[in-house]
UniProtKB/Swiss-Prot annotation:
Record carries keyword GTP-binding: no
PROSITE patterns per UniProt: TOPO_IIA, TOPOISOMERASE_II, TOPRIM
EC number: 5.6.2.2
Organism: Candida glabrata (strain ATCC 2001 / BCRC 20586 / JCM 3761 / NBRC 0622 / NRRL Y-65 / CBS 138) (Yeast)
Residues carrying the site annotation Transition state stabilizer: R779
UniProt cofactor(s): Mg(2+); Mn(2+); Ca(2+)
GO cellular component, one term: synaptonemal complex
Protein name: DNA topoisomerase 2
Length: 1406
């Protein structure tokens, strides 16, 4: 044994040179051969190859240090142009030479040796030790070239400087242990240069020679220098490299990627190459980046100050993270389950950057550790660069990988064929499911639990062996773009997979591996039910390829939409599975029977016995879906893919209204289902969101107006009560809260809302401050019809419309036809499925002018967007684009006043902007000195700025800085046309023309209808006269005679039957039909009036009969006894003459005359509306009573029956037209034809010297919202050329006489001939029950007509007069005004309004 070492022997002190040689891994890395993945340059293919090599990292490092020194010289001397590298493996010799400024050849003042010897032969010497100096070179620690000297057997330095005339050559040997004296010679001519030549000490690296692996890595490093150092020519072994820039360098790698791809795919080298796209960008002088798609994993090639950072670092993370984050934000919009690592793993990035004073993990400098904030520069990836990345196949590769991962995850939840499933308590499993006979079983999927109970009832018929049931909760998930996580968390999808035994993405050719071989869908027969069917089809086609190719796999169970019960002459039930078939039967066959109908909106409407009946007749109720064919897959994708939004828009536009699925088909093609049934779901969403071009309404608005018209809402009604009334009368199915918001929107009158509001905002309906979001709760606010409503929607048109059928009810019309196109006057906005719309509002007077131009076959004038009460400026910047400006002016040296905002820019929005400028934030410095609000009914902000901010604001522009500019576009004007098809309008004139054509057609229809009605009325009166005359003359005996005989005599005498519409029917009818009519009449006689009302109220379905078509003789046989008097006979003759006169007057008018008359009435009403609107908006006290009621009761009590009512506060009655004129109506001046944003705002003192807008800008084609017609409706009062005594006023007086004189229910002994002459009575008080609403009628009526029992029961009509044609046509430019008197009943707040408001009597009385 050797003797133990002493302490002195154990602890040694060695020189730094010895330390480097003994522990080289600290300085140059390992000196042993290692296997590494390295990019090497392959001369044969002229590209970089990712190869596994065996190299000594330390040997490569000493070579790299000399190269980096040469590259660093480019930073010190930008004039450097060339680097020469020579590698001679035979002689183990390497040389690196660079031109440019050389090393100073002088003696160091302190160390007393030459500086070249100090730098290359002495450790810890460098020019990089001054940390206050920011450098972008590779050298940092003072080792560099000295390490190369230490690990070489011979190291020679040569540098020359012609400026000082010297050349310096010095050699070291034996690992820098032997230093030969320098040789300094004269050097007068030639370039400056530095050359280092060395022979590495291969014995220290365990090598005998420079092998191919190390040579390949060294050559690649030379190419690195060529690509990363700009404007330098690099030569290798005397040959110039062809690389000219960093982009050329990157291409060497992409060639390799293409070669690797060919190898992986088994392609030959002759196969055409598809080199990946290079996305190169030089961001700045310090940053160059390039991007390509990687095939395998994340790859990077990066350089910091010419140093190859082979393991990356903070600079690589800095760039990669930006790309990943921005690409992820885009991809997540398409596929939400994308993870950042999935993006990064498909990226190959190249970075060449200059970093100030870089820090690395070690002397080997393979990884940068400098923090981003210390880089000395930024490299922000632009959006354009990201967009270029998105155009590569990066997204495709990411989605493919994500889909593969998702599929693997989804397969974990696959089902299997097993006989029992215990995870789903609601499953009614078939006994044979999961057995060898499972493919014969059918799973019934029902829409909800209620439908499940009905399906279970049906199992009693078909048995439980081969049928099972399971309920769906709500709608299925659209799996086409859903993430794997969403699908895995969707309980319905997972349940179906388990119950059916489905396996994700398995290609099915038959169903023998499933628990159930058939899937049956049992949903409601509505649009939502169709959508559920479509989602299930989409789910199967997306997740289980092949299943839809199997005939009979997918089935649907259909139920009737309407059932007709025939009661006479036979008892029979007819089921209809679509509405067109029902409507056809109703038109062609219904007159033969007495019948009633029942609508089945959902499965819940059917009873258990009916379900049993359905299951007993499966041939009728089961419909198989045809196996996939043709373009079915494309159609499914069209219906459910987010990528097909534009195609889906066109698909919806081409739909022809009335197209339905043929119910007689036994097999339903999926294409037919999508194009004829599923499409209705998307259309229904558009119908709710996009208005009709004819009335400008969406269905909710139309339903509200219909209810108000139907109930004659002339006294205010609480919104909380009106909403349920609308829901009840129109069968609204989307919740009362939605109706509340619709009502509030229709009544809002602040600037930016309706140009004409048809409901009065009696209460807090919202303000301009928040755009109406500050409206009070529905239980505190009231509304009623505005008087202008019936001047826009003329009651004479009501009988002409086609009304919608909902839940056994005839509800609102498909569309109204206003006198003027409200879609232009109030505008419209909405977002539907595939379509959206934005139609700005226009001035009603401009619209009327253009209608009259069309009526006169003249060219239309241009129209510009217009907002009631708005005083800003509207500038036309393009044919279909405008810009709205608020109003701002300078009122002091540094004081500004904002007095108007762009329309529909709410006060709160501007206030937030101003407060941010006043208080500032983390990102915004305060720039407003002070701000005051002085709003009343108008806008007023007072803003004070500093001198500096005032100057800055002038440069930026007042309108821009205060956000007083807002765009408005006419490029997305979409509406349903008169055919019910979606149409995009390119110009407002197109909208007006479409409206004009239909409206004019309907004026002709109105005339035809009124003509026919007058003729029927005249004929009816003639037959009544004839009937009474025959009874008086006793030529016709009606007493003590069988009814059948009497009717036969009336037929022989030529008396027609008259139906409820007033149409006569002459001649005999079938005996069976006559028997039904007679029996129905007998039943009516037996029932008391009270019982009849109760029956009508309680029965869901109305009994219909042939009398609807043929009519009855009630107009004759139902006459009161006193009608047989001589006075009544004479009165009827007079009435007949009046009808004939009215008919003559009507025939003299054309359709255009009728429209012009309505326009005259509209303009008069619009003048009154403007006055009323201004009065309401300027009223200091809003009309609301919710506060009082809230104080009387609890928080939520609207009415306290125990409390004593107090009389409502009254507003002084307005009796004179001058009362409105007391409100100062300032005409709005036309805005100058200049862009206000350019106007230099000066204080008032200099206003006189301020150049005009026109002089300063020279801009024209600016329209003003504030402009008015040359003759305004407020500047003068013009009496009408024709007195209203011949029109409405006279008619109203006569109607009031009749209404007050006759009571339909009065006993005969209380009615005498003297009653025919009565005095005019005043209108009933507000608290009294209003008379029943009556259908439109054209002419003046007499007392006798309303006394008829026939008309009392059947013709609930409001009579509307035909106005005489005016002697000279009124136009929109000439307005008419008439005095306004508001009686007690029309007061803003009535004495008895509390009683009226709390009563629903008017809405429940039918």
């Amino acid at each position: 044994m050797s003797e133990p070492k002493t302490a002195s022997e154990r602890y040694q002190k060695i020189s730094q040179l010895e330390h480097i040689l003994k522990r080289p891994d600290t300085y140059i890395g390992s000196v042993e051969i290692q296997e590494q993945e390295q990019w090497i340059y392959d001369e044969e293919t002229d590209c970089m190859i990712d190869k596994t090599v065996n190299i000594v990292p330390g040997l490569f490092k000493i070579f790299d240090e000399i190269l980096v020194n040469a590259a660093d010289n480019k930073v010190r001397d930008p004039s450097m142009k060339r680097i020469d590298v020579t590698i001679n493996p035979e002689e183990n010799f390497i040389e690196v030479r660079n031109d440019g400024k050389g090393i100073p050849i002088e003696i160091h003042e302190k160390e007393k040796i030459y500086i070249p010897e100090l730098i290359f032969g002495h450790l810890l010497t460098s020019s990089n030790y001054d940390d206050d100096e920011k450098k972008v070179t590779g050298g940092r620690n003072g080792y560099g070239a000295k390490l190369c000297n230490i690990f070489s057997t011979e190291f020679t330095l040569e540098t020359a400087d012609p400026k000082n005339g010297r050349k310096y050559v010095q050699t070291w040997e034996n690992n820098m242990n032997v230093c030969h004296p320098p040789k300094i010679t004269s050097y007068k001519k030639g370039p400056s240069y530095t050359k280092v030549a060395f022979k590495p000490d291969l014995s220290r690296f365990g090598m005998e020679s420079l092998d191919s692996d190390i040579l390949g890595v060294m050559r690649r490093r030379v190419y690195d220098i060529n690509g990363s150092v700009r404007d330098v020519n690099v030569y290798l072994n005397g040959k110039p490299l062809k690389i000219r820039n960093f982009k050329n360098y990157v291409e060497l790698y992409l060639k390799s990627l293409e070669k690797m791809r060919k190898m992986d795919n088994g392609e030959s080298d002759t196969t055409p190459s598809n080199i990946p796209t290079i996305l190169y960008e030089r961001v700045s002088d310090r940053w160059e980046i390039a991007f390509a798609v990687s095939d395998i994993s994340f790859k990077q090639v990066s350089f910091v100050n010419s140093i190859a950072t082979t393991t990356g670092g903070t600079h690589v993370n800095y760039i990669a993270d930006q790309i990943v984050r921005k690409v992820s934000d885009i991809l997540k919009k398409k596929k939400k389950n994308i993870k950042p690592y999935q993006i990064k793993n498909n990226m190959f990035i190249f970075i060449n950057c200059l970093i100030e004073n870089p820090a690395f993990t070690s002397q080997t400098k393979e990884q940068l550790t400098t923090r981003v904030k210390d880089f000395g520069s930024r490299c922000d990836i632009s959006s354009d660069y990201i967009n270029k990345i998105m155009k590569t196949d990066l997204a495709t590769k990411i989605f493919e990988i994500a889909d593969e991962n998702a599929n693997n995850a989804l397969k974990k939840s696959d089902g299997s064929r097993k006989s029992r499933i215990t995870d789903y308590p609601k499953l009614e499993d078939a006994n044979k499911a999961g057995t060898k006979d499972g493919y014969k079983c059918t799973l019934i999927l029902t829409e909800g639990d209620s439908a499940l109970s009905l399906a279970v009832a049906g199992l009693a018929v078909v048995g439980r062996d081969y049928y099972g049931c399971y309920p769906l909760r709500g709608k299925m998930l659209n799996v086409r773009e859903a993430t794997a996580d969403q699908i895995l968390k969707n309980a319905e999808i997972q349940a179906i997979k388990k119950i059916m035994g489905l396996q994700h993405r398995k290609k099915y050719e038959d169903t023998k591996s499933l628990r159930y071989g058939h899937l049956m869908i049992m949903t409601d027969q509505d649009h939502d039910g169709s959508h559920i069917k479509g989602l299930i089809i989409n789910f199967i086609e997306t997740s289980f390829p092949g299943l839809l190719d199997i005939p009979g796999f997918l089935i649907e169970f259909i139920t009737p939409i309407v059932k007709v019960t025939i009661t006479k002459p036979i008892k029979k039930v007819i089921s209809f599975f679509n509405l067109p078939d029902y409507e056809k039967w109703r038109e062609e066959e219904s007159h033969k029977y007495s019948w009633k109908q029942k609508y089945y909106k959902g499965l819940g409407t059917s009873t258990s016995p009916e379900i049993i009946e359905y299951f007993s007749n499966l041939d009728t109720h089961l419909k198989k879906f045809h196996a996939l064919q043709g373009d079915d897959k494309d159609l499914i994708d069209l219906a459910f893919s987010k990528k097909k939004a534009d195609d889906r828009k066109e698909w919806l536009r081409q739909y022809e209204p009335g197209t339905v699925l043929d119910p007689t088909l036994n097999e339903i093609p999926i294409s037919d289902f999508i194009n004829k049934e599923l499409i209705l779901f998307s259309l229904a969403d558009n119908v709710r969101s996009i208005p009709s071009v004819l009335d400008g309404f969406k269905p909710g608005q139309r339903k509200v107006l219909y209810t108000c018209f139907k109930k004659n809402l002339t006294t205010e009604k609480k919104v909380a009560n009106l909403a349920p009334a609308v829901s009840d009368y129109t069968a609204y199915h989307h919740g009362e809260q939605a109706l509340v918001q619709t009502i509030i929107g229709m009544a809002q009158n602040f600037v930016g809302t309706n140009n004409i509001y048809f409901l009065k905002p009696n209460g807090a309906f919202g303000t301009r401050a928040t755009g109406g979001k500050d409206a009070a709760a529905a239980r505190y606010i009231y509304t009623e019809l505005n008087k202008i409503a019936r001047k826009v929607f003329h009651p004479a048109d009501d009988p002409l419309f086609r009304y919608v059928q909902e839940d056994e009810k005839t509800v609102e019309p498909e569309w109204y036809l206003p006198v003027v196109p409200m879609v232009l006057i109030n505008g419209a906005e909405g977002i539907g499925t595939g379509w959206s719309t934005s139609i700005p509002p226009f001035n009603p007077l401009d619209v009327v002018n253009n209608i009259r131009h069309l009526l006169n076959d003249e060219e239309m004038d241009d129209m510009h967007p217009w907002f009631r009460g708005w005083t800003g400026t509207m500038e036309k910047i393009e044919s279909q684009r405008y810009r709205m400006y608020g109003r701002i002016e300078q009122v002091g040296p540094n004081t500004l006043e904002i007095t108007e905002l762009p329309a529909r820019t709410w006060t709160s929005t501007i206030k937030e902007h101003l407060l941010l400028g006043l208080g500032g934030s983390e990102k915004v410095k305060p720039w407003i000195k002070d701000m005051e609000e002085q709003h009343a009914e108008t806008i007023k902000f007072i803003i004070k700025l500093t001198d500096e901010e005032m100057t800055k604001t002038r440069k930026l522009g007042f309108y821009e800085r205060f956000k007083l500019i807002s765009p408005i576009s006419l490029q997305n004007m979409v509406a349903f046309d008169y055919r019910g098809k979606i149409k995009k309008y390119d110009h407002v004139h197109e909208i007006l023309k479409d409206f004009y054509e239909v409206r004019l057609e309907y004026y002709q229809k109105r005339k035809d209808y009124m003509t026919g009605r007058l003729q029927w009325e005249a004929e009816k009166l003639s037959f009544q006269v004839k009937f009474i005359k025959m009874i008086i003359d006793k030529s016709l005996i009606v007493t003590n005679k069988p009814k059948k005989q009497l009717i036969s005599e009336l037929e022989e005498l030529g008396f027609p039957r008259i139906n409820k519409e007033g149409k006569p029917h002459f001649g005999k009818i079938d005996e069976e039909v006559e028997a039904i009519i007679s029996e129905d009449e007998d039943e009516d006689l037996e029932e008391s009036e009270e019982a009849t009302r109760k029956k009508d109220k309680d029965d869901e379905s109305t009994v219909n009969g042939p009398e609807e078509l043929f009519g009855t003789y009630e107009y004759l046989l139902g006459l009161k006894i006193w009608s047989l008097t001589k006075e009544r006979y004479e009165k009827l003759l007079k009435q007949k003459q009046e009808k004939e006169t009215e008919l003559e007057n009507l025939l003299k008018l054309s359709a255009k005359d009728l429209w012009n008359n309505d326009l005259d009435d509209f303009l008069t009403a619009y003048e009154d509306f403007q006055k009323m609107d201004l009065f309401l908006r300027n009223s200091a006290v809003p009309k609301t009573k919710g506060g009082k009621r809230k104080r009387k009761g609890g928080d939520d009590d609207d009415y306290d029956p125990s409390g004593k009512k107090k009389p409502a506060r009254r507003i002084k009655k307005i009796k004179k037209e001058d009362d409105f004129d007391r409100i100062l109506i300032k005409p709005q001046a036309k805005i100058k034809a200049k862009r206000p944003v350019k106007v230099k705002v000066e204080p008032p003192s200099s206003a006189a010297s301020t150049p005009s807008v026109k002089e300063e800008l020279g801009v024209s084609d600016v329209t003003s919202n504030a402009s008015t017609p040359s003759t305004t409706i407020f500047d003068q009062k013009v009496k009408q050329e024709n007195s209203d005594e011949s029109g409405i006023s006279a008619f109203s007086s006569k109607f009031n006489k009749i209404a007050s004189a006759f009571d339909e229910d009065a006993p005969l002994d209380q009615i005498t001939s003297e009653d025919t002459s009565v005095k005019e009575s005043s209108a009933p008080a507000a608290k009294k029950k209003a008379p029943p609403k009556r259908k439109a009628k054209v002419v003046e009526s007499s007392e006798d007509e309303l006394s008829d029992a026939n008309l009392s029961e059947q013709d609930d009509e409001e009579v509307v007069p035909v106005r005489r044609q005016r002697s000279s046509r009124q136009t929109a430019k000439k307005s008419y005004a008439e005095p306004i008197e508001i009686s007690d009943e029309e007061d803003f707040i009535d004495d008895d309004e509390d009683e009226e408001v709390d009563s629903d009597e008017s809405f429940n009385d039918e």
